[in-house]
């Protein structure tokens, strides 16, 4: 099995629960949600919890370790759900 680490970058305001439910329903082994304290994305808008802003769209990263082909198939089937996310893959070795 060729496991990879998939990271899904999004903002807190986007529907995080939908993402997690899709991963769960898709048979993905597990997912971890990490919330950033500051960041910016493609729109070049800075988000931080230390600066008073009208919107607290703080960055969120969902990490998943799973078989590469399974993740690619999952993303093809759920393209519409994750269309506004930035997604990366990294090779990993899973300790057993």
UniProtKB/Swiss-Prot annotation:
Name of one Pfam family that matches: DUF190
Database matches in InterPro entries: N-reg_PII-like_a/b (IPR011322), N-reg_PII/ATP_PRibTrfase_C (IPR015867), UPF0166 (IPR003793)
Taxonomy, superkingdom: Bacteria
Gene3D superfamilies xrefs: 3.30.70.120
Family: Belongs to the UPF0166 family.
Name listed for the protein in its UniProt record: UPF0166 protein aq_448
Source organism (scientific name): Aquifex aeolicus (strain VF5)
């Amino acid at each position: 099995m060729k496991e990879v680490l998939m990271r899904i970058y999004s903002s807190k305001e986007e529907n995080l629960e939908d993402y997690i439910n899709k991963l769960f329903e898709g048979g993905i082994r597990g997912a971890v949600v990490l919330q950033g304290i500051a960041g910016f994305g493609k729109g070049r808008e800075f988000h931080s919890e230390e600066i008073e802003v009208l919107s607290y769209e703080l960055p969120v990263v969902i990490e998943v370790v799973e078989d590469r082909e399974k993740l690619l198939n999952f993303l093809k089937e759920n393209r519409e759900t994750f269309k506004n996310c930035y997604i990366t893959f990294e090779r990993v070795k899973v300790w057993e």
